[in-house]
């Protein structure tokens, strides 16, 4: 049951992190009459622009986080980013607050060490070989054991920040410094991963609901510098490999528990499926579902956490392509007239208050009778949008 927003009987969601994904979650939750409060570390974040109210705090600060939760007394606490004090979330959950999907799942998936150890050491899922390092000397030793080439990532970061590929020993120090500069949270620990020459990588959106687990069609995607660049749905997979992917996704999401959508990232090499990462919330590559599915990943997430039924049916092949800034500017302007002329496409601008070089400012979406055409159209639209 839901009440009326801004009245005493309102059902309240407190969103921790107010980026473009959270913005869409709030829009979907508001369609069901849910009162939405957005929280982030800076003013005018995308989700704040559509929320009933917002707060600006450092979410890594235990006292500040506890204070805003106790002030708002939400029915659901919905994390959207990694930079959150997860120990405080566990405390609040023990005091009766509901963290989506669970506080433990949030804590485990916020750092690559926790989720990698869970996937490989506890559940026995196939992963890339990995080591952890807390200083430069340990990193050099780990690289020697893993072998070159290999991947270096902070154990806590987002959107590919801090990620490097080691191609020779001379790259190690630069990679270490870059990882430290981009790390979110406390400490400087990094993960060293085996470089896998996979055939392709997918996101398998996995919805845990009161009615059971549902899988969206696989989403293919390409990353540039470790960050999502374009995605498409469906990505073709043979039935046995798809079944392996679903089995792996169910195993990891069942262990994490709770309700909501999970973005499970997987590599595929020949007919083998290799676990990469999992996010207990909507995934950036899943923005394509805004045009490909009956219900977008955002609607599915909102419905699942509210205990409502979901539909994962696909209605059309489609694609997404990021719109990135090439300039640094406060309150940028967008030329979208030419881009809006392209048939069967949509533009979603996120409303970020400042444009930075390489920052994701929007996404172009396209549908077609096949994903190849959709990818071409989405890329065309993305490049037609001019940020000034």
Curated annotation (Swiss-Prot):
<keyword id="KW-0479">Metal-binding</keyword>
<feature type="binding site">
    <location>
        <begin position="20"/>
        <end position="21"/>
    </location>
    <ligand>
        <name>N(1)-(5-phospho-beta-D-ribosyl)glycinamide</name>
    </ligand>
</feature>
<feature type="binding site">
    <location>
        <position position="284"/>
    </location>
    <ligand>
        <name>N(1)-(5-phospho-beta-D-ribosyl)glycinamide</name>
    </ligand>
</feature>
<protein>
    <recommendedName>
        <fullName>Formate-dependent phosphoribosylglycinamide formyltransferase</fullName>
        <ecNumber>6.3.1.21</ecNumber>
    </recommendedName>
</protein>
<feature type="binding site">
    <location>
        <position position="112"/>
    </location>
    <ligand>
        <name>ATP</name>
    </ligand>
</feature>
<keyword id="KW-0436">Ligase</keyword>
<keyword id="KW-0658">Purine biosynthesis</keyword>
<keyword id="KW-0067">ATP-binding</keyword>
<feature type="binding site">
    <location>
        <begin position="359"/>
        <end position="360"/>
    </location>
    <ligand>
        <name>N(1)-(5-phospho-beta-D-ribosyl)glycinamide</name>
    </ligand>
</feature>
<dbReference type="Pfam" id="PF02222">
    <property type="entry name" value="ATP-grasp"/>
</dbReference>
<feature type="binding site">
    <location>
        <position position="265"/>
    </location>
    <ligand>
        <name>Mg(2+)</name>
    </ligand>
</feature>
<comment type="pathway">
    <text>Purine metabolism; IMP biosynthesis via de novo pathway; N(2)-formyl-N(1)-(5-phospho-D-ribosyl)glycinamide from N(1)-(5-phospho-D-ribosyl)glycinamide (formate route): step 1/1.</text>
</comment>
<feature type="binding site">
    <location>
        <position position="201"/>
    </location>
    <ligand>
        <name>ATP</name>
    </ligand>
</feature>
<comment type="similarity">
    <text>Belongs to the PurK/PurT family.</text>
</comment>
<dbReference type="InterPro" id="IPR011054">
    <property type="entry name" value="Rudment_hybrid_motif"/>
</dbReference>
<dbReference type="InterPro" id="IPR013815">
    <property type="entry name" value="ATP_grasp_subdomain_1"/>
</dbReference>
<feature type="domain" description="ATP-grasp">
    <location>
        <begin position="117"/>
        <end position="306"/>
    </location>
</feature>
<feature type="binding site">
    <location>
        <position position="277"/>
    </location>
    <ligand>
        <name>Mg(2+)</name>
    </ligand>
</feature>
<feature type="binding site">
    <location>
        <begin position="193"/>
        <end position="196"/>
    </location>
    <ligand>
        <name>ATP</name>
    </ligand>
</feature>
<dbReference type="InterPro" id="IPR011761">
    <property type="entry name" value="ATP-grasp"/>
</dbReference>
<dbReference type="InterPro" id="IPR016185">
    <property type="entry name" value="PreATP-grasp_dom_sf"/>
</dbReference>
<feature type="binding site">
    <location>
        <position position="80"/>
    </location>
    <ligand>
        <name>N(1)-(5-phospho-beta-D-ribosyl)glycinamide</name>
    </ligand>
</feature>
<dbReference type="GO" id="GO:0005524">
    <property type="term" value="F:ATP binding"/>
</dbReference>
<dbReference type="InterPro" id="IPR003135">
    <property type="entry name" value="ATP-grasp_carboxylate-amine"/>
</dbReference>
<feature type="binding site">
    <location>
        <position position="153"/>
    </location>
    <ligand>
        <name>ATP</name>
    </ligand>
</feature>
<dbReference type="InterPro" id="IPR048740">
    <property type="entry name" value="PurT_C"/>
</dbReference>
<dbReference type="GO" id="GO:0004644">
    <property type="term" value="F:phosphoribosylglycinamide formyltransferase activity"/>
</dbReference>
<keyword id="KW-0460">Magnesium</keyword>
<feature type="binding site">
    <location>
        <position position="352"/>
    </location>
    <ligand>
        <name>N(1)-(5-phospho-beta-D-ribosyl)glycinamide</name>
    </ligand>
</feature>
<dbReference type="InterPro" id="IPR005862">
    <property type="entry name" value="PurT"/>
</dbReference>
<dbReference type="Pfam" id="PF22660">
    <property type="entry name" value="RS_preATP-grasp-like"/>
</dbReference>
<keyword id="KW-0547">Nucleotide-binding</keyword>
<dbReference type="Pfam" id="PF21244">
    <property type="entry name" value="PurT_C"/>
</dbReference>
<comment type="function">
    <text>Involved in the de novo purine biosynthesis. Catalyzes the transfer of formate to 5-phospho-ribosyl-glycinamide (GAR), producing 5-phospho-ribosyl-N-formylglycinamide (FGAR). Formate is provided by PurU via hydrolysis of 10-formyl-tetrahydrofolate.</text>
</comment>
<feature type="binding site">
    <location>
        <begin position="158"/>
        <end position="163"/>
    </location>
    <ligand>
        <name>ATP</name>
    </ligand>
</feature>
<dbReference type="GO" id="GO:0005829">
    <property type="term" value="C:cytosol"/>
</dbReference>
<dbReference type="InterPro" id="IPR054350">
    <property type="entry name" value="PurT/PurK_preATP-grasp"/>
</dbReference>
<dbReference type="GO" id="GO:0006189">
    <property type="term" value="P:'de novo' IMP biosynthetic process"/>
</dbReference>
<dbReference type="GO" id="GO:0000287">
    <property type="term" value="F:magnesium ion binding"/>
</dbReference>
<dbReference type="GO" id="GO:0043815">
    <property type="term" value="F:phosphoribosylglycinamide formyltransferase 2 activity"/>
</dbReference>
<comment type="subunit">
    <text>Homodimer.</text>
</comment>
């Amino acid at each position: 049951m839901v009440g009326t927003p801004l009245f005493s009987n309102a059902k309240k969601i407190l969103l921790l992190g107010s980026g473009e994904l959270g913005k869409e979650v709030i829009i979907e939750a508001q369609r069901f009459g849910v009162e939405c409060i957005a929280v982030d570390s800076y003013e005018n974040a995308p989700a704040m622009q559509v929320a009933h109210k917002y707060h600006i705090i450092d979410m890594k600060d235990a006292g500040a986080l506890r204070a805003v939760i106790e002030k708002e007394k939400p029915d659901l606490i919905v994390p959207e980013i990694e930079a959150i004090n997860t120990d405080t979330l566990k405390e609040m959950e023990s005091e009766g607050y509901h963290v989506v999907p669970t506080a433990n799942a949030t804590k485990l998936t916020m750092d690559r060490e926790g989720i990698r150890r869970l996937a490989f050491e506890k559940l026995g899922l196939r992963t890339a070989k990995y080591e952890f390092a807390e200083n430069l000397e340990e990193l050099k030793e780990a690289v020697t054991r893993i072998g070159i080439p290999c991947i270096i990532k902070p154990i806590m970061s987002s959107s590919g920040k801090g990620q490097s590929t080691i191609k020779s020993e001379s790259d190690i120090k630069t990679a270490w410094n870059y990882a430290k500069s981009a790390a979110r949270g406390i400490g400087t620990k990094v993960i060293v991963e085996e470089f896998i020459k996979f055939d392709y990588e997918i996101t398998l959106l996995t919805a845990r609901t009161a009615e059971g687990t549902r899988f969206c069609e696989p989403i293919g995607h390409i990353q540039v510098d470790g960050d999502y660049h374009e995605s498409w749905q469906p990505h073709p997979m043979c039935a046995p490999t798809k079944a392996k992917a679903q089995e792996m996704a169910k195993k990891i999401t069942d262990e994490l528990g709770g309700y909501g959508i999970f973005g499970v990232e997987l590599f595929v090499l020949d007919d083998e499926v290799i676990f990469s990462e999992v996010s207990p919330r909507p995934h950036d590559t899943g923005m394509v579902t805004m045009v490909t599915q009956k219900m977008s990943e955002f609607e599915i997430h909102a419905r699942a956490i509210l205990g409502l039924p979901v539909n994962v049916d696909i209605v059309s092949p489609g694609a997404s392509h990021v719109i990135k800034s090439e300039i640094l500017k406060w309150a940028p302007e967008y030329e979208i007239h030419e881009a809006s002329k392209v048939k069967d496409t949509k533009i979603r601008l996120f409303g970020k208050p400042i444009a930075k070089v390489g920052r994701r400012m929007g996404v172009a979406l396209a549908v077609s009778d096949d994903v190849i055409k959709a990818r071409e159209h989405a890329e065309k639209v993305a490049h037609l949008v001019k940020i000034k």
